[in-house]
Regions:
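Exported/periplasmic cell-wall-interacting domains
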Residues: 2-37, 125-128, 132-227
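Gly/Pro-biased beta-strand-loop elements
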Residues: 56-173, 227
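N-terminal, intrinsically disordered, polar/charged segments of Gram-positive cell-envelope systems
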Residues: 28-76
Length: 227
């Protein structure tokens, strides 16, 4: 093989490598499912769709039991509440002022990055169908009736991006990144945060923030482990 041919083959190999990396990054960048904030307003359990798929494995959703809040948080106001998510240690903490009310393990983004910054919950769904990822990269997911979903946003990360905190029935690997960008929690623990955080939802299956019923602040920081 001549020197010219070797150079040509090297350039072709380099081009293919760059193209593959770009394709992978593009697929990962869109792995988090988007949402239409003005169209999707149902938080009801969909009994016609109970079987989904996560990472090539069939998964089945179940209706969740009603969460009973501990007495010490009943009647508390939203003004001094905040949620902190530590990506480095894969933990979520809920505060009222300086008092820590809850601390739970979570799973943040693995196939898609969880954004960092200060956000506000803008809507809550008792149940929410979610799908996204990439079949080519084998990260596709189709998850019906995701429980206790709390979507958050800020000026840089709009509501349509679909980032949220929610319960999880398709894995039990908390403490390790396992999501496409959202914050995965054990379902019963997500239920406690859901009932505690604003906007106050009461018996409503879907609630959106208003001036009179604001969403709780969510602060996300750190760097998730690479696993």
């Amino acid at each position: 093989m001549s020197k010219t041919h070797r150079i040509l083959f090297s350039l072709i190999a380099l081009f293919l490598t760059v193209a593959t990396i770009a394709q992978t990054r593009t697929a990962l960048g869109r792995s988090q499912a988007s949402i239409n904030p003005d169209f999707e307003t149902s938080g009801e359990y969909d009994s016609t769709q109970t079987v989904g798929e996560f990472y090539g494995t069939p998964v089945v959703s179940q209706p969740v039991a009603e969460v009973i809040q501990p007495a010490h948080v009943l009647g508390s106001t939203n003004e001094n509440k905040r949620i902190e998510v530590d990506l480095t240690n894969q933990r979520l903490s809920a505060y009222e002022g300086d008092q820590k009310i809850y601390e739970f393990l979570i799973s943040s983004g693995k196939w898609g990055r969880t954004p960092t910054g200060t956000f506000r919950i803008w809507s809550k769904f008792r149940y929410k169908n979610m799908s996204g990822g990439s079949k080519e990269l084998r990260t596709y997911y189709n998850l019906p009736n995701v429980p206790y979903t709390m979507f958050f946003s800020n000026d840089a990360i709009p509501a349509a991006r679909g980032f949220g905190i929610h319960g999880t029935y398709w894995h039990d690997n908390f403490g390790h990144p396992m999501s496409h960008g959202c914050i995965n929690m054990r379902t019963e623990e997500a239920g406690l945060i859901y009932e505690w955080a604003g906007p106050v939802s009461g018996t409503n299956k879907y609630t959106r923030t208003t001036t009179e019923n604001p969403g709780t602040e969510v602060v996300i920081f750190g760097v998730a482990p690479r696993e």
